[in-house]
């Protein structure tokens, strides 16, 4: 596990900038990498400049595949021993992406000779070394009741009389689609009441199943009947991490693209009267790795397309700005709090953290059966509280096809409202550069306007 930021809490690797840029020569595009991530050998994410359209991108793909094939041909001769040594072939383009009509590029496995030519192409903005991504696993386990729902529905610290009471509007989440970009979801679990569906599996050759449990746990906190914040929301599983809880930045970017496109299609269908009752989409990503400009840009592009996005701050007890997607400024970045209203000892912090939500000893749905549950901890558990809360607040608006439809609340406005109505100053052990804000759902009110009018506390 050398260099892998996986399942344990690790210290911040460097106090310097989390991103390094290789030397630029002859006007070539820079190759960037994160100094606190595990790079995948010979794997790259190539991002086009803004002027590149789909036809130019297609021509570029043909060009790079021709170069790749030529290099692989030379390497095949080497494998046959004609030049005296053996080597491995490279796989070429793995994904192409165009996130919400904005961020465009591709990812693949290339020889360094190919990359040297790619970085000199006038259409290329930058190249990022692909790296490992992982879910934020549980730093501690204690079988306990799901106190987190109760906490976000009460202003004051929980007491004996309130610790297990969740105040909520019964229709919370109705008409909202929640995309859980993670390890998958146990869609047959009874707590989803048939509202969970399999969306897309991104890792090549992987199965449409959650073999880990992490994604299912997040989905339950978002939309489960018993364990969820928004109990009527629909869940769509977008699998970007394998059963061991790890994956690649390029697969995560592709997952964000898929979710954004699904949201755009659903929104268009609603405007055309073909998606009755649709109110909007949210997404949750309880995962991360080193700093990735491409992933942060992909998340921001999805938000610009109208998706409400929650991401975990990370479990390194460090500055969230050094990790992606926690550093994506248009998403809601979520730190973890405890039952005692403290910042969880593992939770990341800093100016990139927008809000806190319960993240220690959270009970939710699990894998293994349609009744399975598990208690785990992490900012991974805090973020779906916010994704569920975003879905909850979106659902309080009239649907697009309603006679009472109003101008749709934008992700920017809802993020501002979420912060405005949060309980301020409730938490301890909050660094001075970190917002001391704990999420609040309006205490059971179904009137969004009234909730926002109450402001913070």
From Swiss-Prot:
The keyword Signal applies. Pfam families: Inhibitor_I9, Peptidase_S8. Keywords: Allergen, Glycoprotein, Hydrolase, Protease, Serine protease, Signal, Zymogen. It is an enzyme of class 3 (hydrolase). Residues 146-457 form the Peptidase S8 domain. Residues 43-134 form the Inhibitor I9 domain. It comes from the Eukaryota. GO terms for biological process: proteolysis. The keyword Signal applies. Its EC number is 3.4.21.-. Residues 17-136 form a propeptide. Belongs to the peptidase S8 family. This is Subtilisin-like serine protease Pen c 2. It comes from Penicillium citrinum.
């Amino acid at each position: 596990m050398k260099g892998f930021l996986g399942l344990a809490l690790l210290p911040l690797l460097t106090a310097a900038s989390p991103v390094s840029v290789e030397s630029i020569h002859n006007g070539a595009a820079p190759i960037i990498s994160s100094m606190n991530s595990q790079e995948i050998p010979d794997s790259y994410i190539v991002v086009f400049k803004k002027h590149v359209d789909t036809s130019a991108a297609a021509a570029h793909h043909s060009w790079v595949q021709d170069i790749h094939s030529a290099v692989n041909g030379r390497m095949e001769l080497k494998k046959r021993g004609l030049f005296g040594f053996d080597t491995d072939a490279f796989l070429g383009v793995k994904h192409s992406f165009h996130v919400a009509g904005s961020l465009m590029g591709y990812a693949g496995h290339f020889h360094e000779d190919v990359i040297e030519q790619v970085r000199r192409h006038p259409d290329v903005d930058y190249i990022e070394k692909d790296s490992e991504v992982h879910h934020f696993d549980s730093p501690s386990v204690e079988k306990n009741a799901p106190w987190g729902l109760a906490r976000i529905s009460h202003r004051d610290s929980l007491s004996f009389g309130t610790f297990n009471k969740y105040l909520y509007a019964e229709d919370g989440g109705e008409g909202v689609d929640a995309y859980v970009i993670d390890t998958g979801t146990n869609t047959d679990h009874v707590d989803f009441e048939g509202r969970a569906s399999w969306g897309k599996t991104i890792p090549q050759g992987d199965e449409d199943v959650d073999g880990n449990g992490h994604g299912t746990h997040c989905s339950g906190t978002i939309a489960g009947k018993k364990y969820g914040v928004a109990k009527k929301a629909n869940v769509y599983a977008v699998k970007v991490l394998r059963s061991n809880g790890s994956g690649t930045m390029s697969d995560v970017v592709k997952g964000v693209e898929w979710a954004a496109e699904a949201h755009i299609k659903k929104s268009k269908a609603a405007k055309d009267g073909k998606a009755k009752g649709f109110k909007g989409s949210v997404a949750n990503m309880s995962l991360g790795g080193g700093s990735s400009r491409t992933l942060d840009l992909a998340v921001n592009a999805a938000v610009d397309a109208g998706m409400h996005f929650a991401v975990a701050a990370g479990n390194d007890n460090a500055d969230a700005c050094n990790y992606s997607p926690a550093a994506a400024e248009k998403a809601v970045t979520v730190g973890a709090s405890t039952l005692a209203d403290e910042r969880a000892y593992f939770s990341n912090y800093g100016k990139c953290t927008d809000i806190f939500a319960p993240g220690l000893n959270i009970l939710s749905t699990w894998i293994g059966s349609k009744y399975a549950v598990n208690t785990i901890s992490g900012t991974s558990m805090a973020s779906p509280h916010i994704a569920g809360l975003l879905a909850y607040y979106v659902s309080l608006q009239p649907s697009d096809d309603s006679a009472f439809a109003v101008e749709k609340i934008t992700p920017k406005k809802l993020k501002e409202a979420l912060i405005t109505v949060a309980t301020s100053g409730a938490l301890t052990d909050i660094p001075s550069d970190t917002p001391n804000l704990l999420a609040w759902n309006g205490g059971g009110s179904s009137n969004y306007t009234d909730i926002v009018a109450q402001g913070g506390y």
